[in-house]
Amino acid sequence: MALKEYQVVGRKVPTEHEPVPKLFRMRLFAPNESVAKSRYWYFLKMINKVKKATGEIVAINEISEPKPLKAKVFGIWIRYDSRSGTHNMYKEFRDTTRVGAVEAMYADMAARHRARFRSIRILKVVEVEKKEDVRRNYVKQLLNPHLKFPLPHRRTGVVGLAGKKVFAPHRPSTFY
C-alpha cells in the first residue's frame, strides 16, 4: 500500500448561531485524498462531534518530507483493536520518511498482531532527535556509527562471458 501524508482542515458549516466556527486540522496517512477525507470525518465525529453532514472541508494538502534522503528514527504511538480488545502501543522505526515509517508500522502490525489498516489509529508520529531518547533495542543496534554487515556469500568470476569456463575441476568455495 503506497501511503501519502495529508493535512486536512475542516469545520462546521457556518450558521447564524456560529458564524465563524472553529477549524480542526489533522495529519493523516492514506493512499489517496478520498480515503484521507473519509478518515478525517471518522476521527472528527469521534473526537469533536462534528459530522460530515454538518461540516465542510476547507483545505486538503499533501505533506512532503523536508529531508527525504537522511535516515531518521520515528516514534509512533498507536491504538489498535484486536480480537481481545483495544490496546495502546509505542513503536520505533528507522526510515528516511514519515510515510515509510508508517508503512513499516502497518506491515509490522499485520505480521505480528494481525491488525489491519481499518483497526489501527495513529495517535502521533514524532522524529526521535537524540540517540539517548531511542527506547527500543531493535532500533538502538542500528545507531552504531561503526556498524558493519558481513559478506556471507562470495561470488567470484569474470564479468562477462569472455573468461567463463564451461567445465571446472571443482566447485568454487563461496563462503568466507
Curated annotation (Swiss-Prot):
An example Gene Ontology CC term for this record: preribosome
Localization: Cytoplasm
One Pfam family matching this protein: Ribosomal_L18A
InterPro entries named among the record's database cross-references: Ribosomal_eL20, Ribosomal_eL20_dom, Ribosomal_eL20_eukaryotes
SUPFAM superfamilies, alphabetized: RplX-like
The entry's keywords: Cytoplasm, Ribonucleoprotein, Ribosomal protein
Top-rank lineage group of the source organism: Eukaryota
Keyword Ribonucleoprotein found: yes
Listed GO biological process terms: cytoplasmic translation
One term of GO molecular function: structural constituent of ribosome
Keyword Ribosomal protein in record: yes
Family designation: Belongs to the eukaryotic ribosomal protein eL20 family.
Family annotation (HAMAP family): Ribosomal_eL20
Subunit: Component of the large ribosomal subunit (LSU). Mature yeast ribosomes consist of a small (40S) and a large (60S) subunit. The 40S small subunit contains 1 molecule of ribosomal RNA (18S rRNA) and at least 33 different proteins. The large 60S subunit contains 3 rRNA molecules (25S, 5.8S and 5S rRNA) and at least 46 different proteins. eL20 forms multiple interactions with RNA and proteins in the central protuberance, connecting components of core functional centers that are located far apart.
Function according to Swiss-Prot or TrEMBL: Component of the ribosome, a large ribonucleoprotein complex responsible for the synthesis of proteins in the cell. The small ribosomal subunit (SSU) binds messenger RNAs (mRNAs) and translates the encoded message by selecting cognate aminoacyl-transfer RNA (tRNA) molecules. The large subunit (LSU) contains the ribosomal catalytic site termed the peptidyl transferase center (PTC), which catalyzes the formation of peptide bonds, thereby polymerizing the amino acids delivered by tRNAs into a polypeptide chain.
PANTHER family recorded: 60S RIBOSOMAL PROTEIN L18A (PTHR10052)
Miscellaneous information on this protein: There are 2 genes for eL20 in S.pombe.
Protein name (record): Large ribosomal subunit protein eL20A
Organism per entry: Schizosaccharomyces pombe (strain 972 / ATCC 24843) (Fission yeast)
